[in-house]
């Protein structure tokens, strides 16, 4: 491979566990670093950076959360009300500040409400509404050396951006070098009709800058049926510059179980280790073949 892809884990799957404890567990499992939930108010960037670096890790990205945890905190870049759109821009800017403070590379953005497949006006009107807010956020990100990556989410959970090609079409309309796209394998296996590897190759190195990883069952990679060898080979073929951030859940568990602390630490860590080892071994196999 052109380089070894690094592997991270998104800290939302740990629920309310304190960050120092999460970092200790992530380091013990063997990850290269972490992706932080995009809640800038709960972090001290200087303290986070020190905790992470002391463990020999790094922060790869910030996971934008749309909406926020409080009622009315929509963070909605496609809202028909300009004041609400501005609140969304301000939120993304706060995530950019966090990313810059902890040394992260990118901030994930979703231009619609996760968990709400309905549109507010119409799909076209909502897409039109988010162009200028995304451009404002991208300009700010560029000033701080941070990429914004639009995440497509399956049609049962959002109303606007479903596929990688949807995300690229939107990014092209925004027309700023700091707005790119990413993919989440759990959502991609629903929306990418000819397969995840083909979607990655079509996107190419420039656009495709980050990946979330979980198997088709939302368990750790290797515990389901997704073609991980082909997925990693596609990333190699486009000379992927980003990282892979795992966010799996044990079978039968939901994000709400993670939020509420209903996933035993031993089970979660064991499955994260299975997934990480599987991806690393698969990457090594590909490297041995192509070198």
Regions picked out by a protein language model, each given a short descriptive name:
Residues 1-7, 15-27, 103, 161-183, ...:
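Histidine-acidic metal/acid-base catalytic patches
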Residues 1-11, 65-79, 111-118:
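N-terminal small/glycine-rich loop or linker at the start of catalytic domains
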Residues 13-15, 19, 40, 65-68, ...:
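Active-site-proximal loop/turn and secondary-structure-junction residues that shape catalytic pockets
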Residues 22-42:
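Basic, amphipathic N-terminal segments that precede the first structured/catalytic domain
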Residues 35, 61-63, 108, 149, ...:
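Conserved beta-strand positions in the central sheet of alpha/beta enzyme cores
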Residues 35-55, 111-122:
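Glycine-rich, proline-tolerant flexible connector loops at the mouths of alpha/beta enzymes
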Residues 40-60, 89-103, 131-139, 196-202, ...:
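Short amphipathic alpha-helices and their capping/turn segments at secondary-structure boundaries
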Residues 78-180, 190, 266-271, 289-290:
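Active-site acidic/histidine proton-transfer and metal-coordination neighborhood
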């Amino acid at each position: 491979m052109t380089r070894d892809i690094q592997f991270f884990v998104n800290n939302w799957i740990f629920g309310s566990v304190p960050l120092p404890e999460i970092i200790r567990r992530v380091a013990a499992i063997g990850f290269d670093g972490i992706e932080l939930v995009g809640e800038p108010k709960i972090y001290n960037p200087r303290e986070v950076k020190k905790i992470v670096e002391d463990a020999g890790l790094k922060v790869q990205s910030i996971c934008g959360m749309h909406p926020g945890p409080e009622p009315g905190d929509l963070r909605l870049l496609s809202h028909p009300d300009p004041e609400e759109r501005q609140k969304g821009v301000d939120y993304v800017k706060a995530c950019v500040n966090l990313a810059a403070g902890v040394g992260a590379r990118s901030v994930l953005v979703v231009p619609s409400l996760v968990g709400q497949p309905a549109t507010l006006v119409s799909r076209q009107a909502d897409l039109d509404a988010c162009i200028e807010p995304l451009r404002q956020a991208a300009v700010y990100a560029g000033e701080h050396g941070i990429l914004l990556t639009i995440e497509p989410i399956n049609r049962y959970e959002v109303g606007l951006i479903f596929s990688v090609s949807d995300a690229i079409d939107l990014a092209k309309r925004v027309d700023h070098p700091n707005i790119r796209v990413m993919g989440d394998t759990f959502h991609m296996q629903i929306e990418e009709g000819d397969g995840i590897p083909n979607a990655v190759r079509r996107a190419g190195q420039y656009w495709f800058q980050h990946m979330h990883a979980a198997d088709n069952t939302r368990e750790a990679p290797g515990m389901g049926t997704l073609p991980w060898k082909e997925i990693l080979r596609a990333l190699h073929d486009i000379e992927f510059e980003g990282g892979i951030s795992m966010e799996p859940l044990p079978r039968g568990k939901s994000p709400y179980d993670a939020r509420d602390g209903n996933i035993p630490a031993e089970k979660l860590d064991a499955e994260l280790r299975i997934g990480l080892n599987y991806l690393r071994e698969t990457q090594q196999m590909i490297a041995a073949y192509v070198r």
